[in-house]
From Swiss-Prot:
GO terms for molecular function: IMP cyclohydrolase activity; phosphoribosylaminoimidazolecarboxamide formyltransferase activity. The lineage of its organism: Bacteria, Pseudomonadati, Elusimicrobiota, Elusimicrobia, Elusimicrobiales. Its EC number is 2.1.2.3, 3.5.4.10. The IMP cyclohydrolase activity resides in the N-terminal region. One of its GO terms (cellular component) is cytosol. Pathway: Purine metabolism; IMP biosynthesis via de novo pathway; 5-formamido-1-(5-phospho-D-ribosyl)imidazole-4-carboxamide from 5-amino-1-(5-phospho-D-ribosyl)imidazole-4-carboxamide (10-formyl THF route): step 1/1; Purine metabolism; IMP biosynthesis via de novo pathway; IMP from 5-formamido-1-(5-phospho-D-ribosyl)imidazole-4-carboxamide: step 1/1. Belongs to the PurH family. This is Bifunctional purine biosynthesis protein PurH. Keywords: Hydrolase, Multifunctional enzyme, Purine biosynthesis, Transferase. The keyword RNA-binding does not apply.
Length: 517
């Protein structure tokens, strides 16, 4: 269908008045009669526009402090009747109902109000549940063949332009598109109410869960060029601000989130480098330059083309260090002008800014037609459990290194083993099906590290899960490891403890596993 519909009368009732004055003046200029509810009518009259009060159209006043103002047959009849149905037209004429050709409505700010409230069921939250607005939006969207419905200020300009070019009319295609937006808007609104009230009832994992996603970015492709991809967010905008560089790829985004999540686990100035969604270098220091050097030294071959995250604002000295190596992107809480100028000399580097840790309450992962949902792994220690299970206790330096290793290994793909000093990873074994193979891989990377660096004074291992056999401890001993941190919990824990005692290794059990798949 290509049938145009001329807009003669518009009902406007909005909470968000962004762009409304310009839009309403444009409608008035095109000869559209404006009808409005009390608050919006007051706004439009203050802008010098002639406006009919809705109560004049319905013959019925607003009641119950505005809870009932648009729920009236003269409103919904005017919106819902089919203009090409003789029986409908006769009813409308006989009852003296005046047409409404356009509905402009957005809804009470429920999400914003709930976000500020102490409890989901506070009176102010309840009062910001819109009833009349969604009802009108659904009516107008259902009858899009005859009525135009707008619920987003960003559509005002496009609609006005089309009407100006079409003697005040809108095409079927435009009305159809606006219909979809209206139903999406009401669905999201109802979902927000439902999820907020489930939260208020402490329903952590309810029988049904509604997740609303907003498209924030088109991507060139997915993990591989033959896969189509797009970025959606549970918020309206992408949570990193991009200050410079090429558009982010699917893989860049995965690494950006991974490296940022990891670097936020450290209080000291820290640098984390990711490649293929796992760390290839983690370092801390008194200053960021030291942290970067510690992280980069771990595995510069793998770090080439990776993504770097810093947990402190970028400054000139660290920007100069980063500018000398090839990376895809850098993330930091902030950048001074000098550091930005230095980094921007590399035209393709993506410069990302974010000043808060990841805060999502849940992680979602699709598996076929199903979705796995879990709490994020944000716990470093469970009830401060840090139990030495061996005869030898860790020294102060070893304990510091073990805590660094434990904070680091939780971000490595399982099976994960990491060799560290007190402030730097020096060998990472990731993604092996056998834990002893992860130890051997970390050892291989450590041998490469020693070709360019001195052996650290303290060398420890962190393991994301228990050692199922003593072979992992034996392999660690061959590397010169003096202390190990692991969750414990294997039926063969005693064998691993005995092996550690034989080698004079101190071993800590945390009682907390950090699988990452």
């Amino acid at each position: 269908m290509t049938q145009e519909r001329k807009i003669k009368r518009a009902l406007i009732s909005v909470s968000d008045k962004t762009g409304l004055e310009v839009f309403a003046k444009g409608l008035h200029k095109l000869g559209v009669e404006l009808v409005s509810t009390s608050g919006t009518a007051k706004f439009l009259k203050a802008a010098g526009l002639p406006v009919r009060d809705l109560s004049d159209l319905t013959g019925f006043p607003e009641i119950l402090d505005g809870r009932v103002k648009t729920l009236h047959p003269r409103v919904h009849g005017a919106i819902l009747y089919k203009r090409d149905d003789d029986a409908h037209c006769k009813v409308i004429k006989d009852m003296g109902i005046e047409d409404i050709d356009m509905l402009v409505v957005n809804l009470y700010p429920f999400r914003e109000t709930a976000a500020k409230a102490k409890h989901s069921f506070d009176a102010e939250v309840i009062e910001n549940i819109d009833i009349g607005g969604p009802s009108m939006l659904r009516s107008a969207a259902k009858n899009f063949a005859h009525v135009a419905v707008l619920c987003r200020p960003k559509d005002y300009e496009v609609v006005l332009s089309e009407m100006a070019a079409s003697q005040g009319a809108l095409s079927y295609a435009t009305r159809q598109r606006l219909c979809v937006e209206a139903f999406t808007h009401t669905a999201e609104y109802d979902a927000a109410i439902s999820e907020e009230f489930k939260k208020g009832l402490n329903h952590e994992f309810p029988e049904s869960k509604i997740v609303v996603l907003h498209k924030t970015q088109d991507l060139r492709y997915g993990e591989n060029p033959h896969q189509k991809a797009v970025l959606y967010s549970q918020k309206k905008d992408f949570s990193f601000e991009q200050l410079h560089g090429k558009e982010l790829s699917y893989n860049n985004i995965l690494d950006a989130f991974g490296t940022w999540d990891a670097v936020c686990d450290f209080d000291l100035p820290a640098c984390v480098i990711f490649k293929h969604v796992t760390p290839c270098g983690i370092g801390t220091g008194k200053v960021l330059t030291e942290a970067f050097n510690n992280a980069w030294a771990c595995d510069p071959k793998s770090a080439f083309g990776g993504i770097i995250a810093l947990n402190k604002p970028m400054q000139r000295d660290i920007a100069e260090a980063i500018s000398k190596v090839f990376i895809e992107a850098v993330c930091a809480p902030d950048y001074d002008l000098e550091s930005l100028e230095i980094l921007k000399q590399k035209k393709n580097i993506r410069i990302l800014k974010r000043n808060s840790p990841l805060s999502a309450a849940y992680q979602l992962k699709s598996v076929g037609d199903e979705v796995l949902l879990q709490q994020p792994d944000r716990t470093l220690l469970l009830d401060n459990k840090w139990d030495c299970v061996t005869k030898r206790k860790p020294t102060e330096e070893e304990d510091k290194a073990l805590k660094f290793a434990w904070a680091s290994v939780k971000h490595v793909k399982s099976n994960a083993v990491i060799l560290t000093s007190e402030s730097a990873s020096v060998g990472i074994g990731a993604g092996q099906m056998s834990r002893v193979d992860s130890v051997k891989m970390a050892g291989m990377k450590f041998e490469e590290y020693l070709q360019e660096n001195k052996k650290p004074k303290v060398l420890v291992i962190g393991s994301d899960a228990f050692f199922p056999f003593r072979d992992g401890v034996d392999a660690a001993a061959k590397l010169g490891v003096s202390a190990i941190v692991q969750p414990g919990g294997s039926v063969r824990d005693e064998e691993a403890i005995a092996a550690a005692d034989e080698h004079g290794i101190a071993m800590i059990f945390t009682g907390l596993r950090h699988f990452r798949h």
